[in-house]
Amino acid sequence: MIRFFFKRSCLLCLALYVVGTVNGAEVNTTSLAVTGDAVATLPPKENLLLPGETFHVVNHAAFVMLPEGVKSSRPQPWIWYCITRFTGPNYPDHHEKWMHEQFISAGIAVAGVDVGESFGSPRGRKVFDAFYQEMTVNRGFASKPCMFGRSRGGLQASSWAIENAEKVAGIGGFYPVFDLRGYPGLQQAAPAYEMTVQELEAALPRLNPVARLHVLAKAGVPAFFIHGDVDQVVTLEENTAAFIATYEANGAKDIVGLIVAKGQGHNYWPGFFRCRELIDFVISRAGQGAIDSR
């Protein structure tokens, strides 16, 4: 059992707990498409979980799901969702619909850009830079979104946040990846980084998010996650537990939280998608990001 409590006044004070056990199938996350330069096919907005729009950012398909009255709320608070995919399987997917409804109902927009299986690589981060510019400068959204990482989306969210800590209001998600060595593994990640396995291994101290999480801790970026204790795809110990340990070692234990889902793996258990504590945290941080942007 792992228990953490938020103490900083700007956060919701959440007492965390271990959730129950439900069986679920492991998620297949082995697609290896690497970020490309060709113009991506733009999916129709009707394919989104909730009302919004789709658009291009430097040839990459992007989306935003908007709350009602978005034009009257400036700057617009928003959640930056990772991993966004428009080619099977699509993310965000239908399992997350209720969660995103909570975000939208709270007046928080949700947006993301498809950078393929970039695994947090510099090439993918360049697209993220352009997406951030589009959302904040061109569309008037808050300059500090809350990052959200699902599974390997954690690599994308954390790697960009580490390079742009002053532009991030918080980071949350469920069973997120922070260590390239476990998932996807260096063999699979190397092409996305445009390196050989040996080159990537040598560059891990400066490229692997888990080796650089101290940047977020020292910058005071709040974080909250839920992760299963029997996850064999993205292990708790190598990823979110390592995240927590880094925050603790850098004097930031009061701004990080983790719910350990007892008996859960890398699956579609509803508790991951309906975690009230995670949802409240993300809404709170996105809202604070809009306040800080004024």
Identify what each model region corresponds to.
Residues S9-T21:
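Bacterial N-terminal signal peptides
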Residues G24-R74, A189-A192, G287-R294:
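A domain-start/cap signature at the N-terminus of enzymes
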Residues V70, R181-E248:
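The feature captures the conserved acid-bearing segment of alpha/beta-hydrolase catalytic domains
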Residues S73-T84:
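Short beta-strand element of the alpha/beta-hydrolase
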Residues Y91-V110:
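Short amphipathic alpha-helix adjacent to the substrate-entry channel of hydrolases
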Residues F119-G140, S159:
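Alpha/beta-hydrolase active-site loop
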Residues T136-N138, A142-P191:
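Primarily recognizes the serine-hydrolase "nucleophile elbow" in alpha/beta-hydrolase
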Residues E237-R294:
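C-terminal catalytic histidine-bearing segment of alpha/beta-hydrolase fold enzymes
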